[in-house]
Amino acid sequence: MPAMFTALNGLHHREPGPIPAAVEDPRVTIELINDGFHVQDPMVSLSFRFAPHRTAFVTDAMAATDCPDGAYKLGALDVNVVGGHARLVSNGAIAGSTLLLEVAVRRAVCELGLSPVDAVEAATLTPAKAFGFDKPNPVTGAPIGLIAPGFAADFNLADPADWTVEQVWCAGRKLK
């Protein structure tokens, strides 16, 4: 379910819509933009409660990601970023995000109180499984999503106090 809760009708007892269907179907991966703007924190927590091991963090990040507030383009569309929130100049609609995946994990652990295991799984193994990349495949070669024998050795090491990335490893080599 791409960008769960974003631009979807809310839950209603007579017209439940796609949200309960997605949560109840074990084949569906629930994608969330965990920036506190696209999806509010109680809904993120609810997704982990109702769809554990099927909730994946996504960013929907645009070119303004990790850049200062200001005017940007999203394709041919004019976008204004204020406080890290991207909106179309024409009508004020949300226009993608400026979220970094590491921030989604940090928010999950430090602000929502999710377990580090669940938060990291939502950024790694769950999306890898959704695309079949947790097994050898023609796209990534070695499987991804876990730190285990036979898997690609791509990972970040974070400070356990504040979850800021301290080291970046790719193919088993330290980059940062």
At which residue positions do the language-model features occur?
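Catalytic cores of alpha/beta
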Residues: D41-S47
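Short, Lys/Arg- and Gly-enriched loop/turn segments at beta-strand edges
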Residues: D162-V168
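Active-site metal-binding loops of divalent metal-dependent hydrolases
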Residues: M4, D35, A61
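Histidine/acidic-residue-rich, glycine-tolerant segments that coordinate divalent metal ions
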Residues: P2-P18, A64-C67
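Glycine-rich anion/phosphate-binding loop at the beta-strand->alpha-helix junction
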Residues: D35-D41
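His/Asp/Glu-enriched, well-ordered alpha-helical/loop segment
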Residues: G17-L32, F48-F151, F155-A158
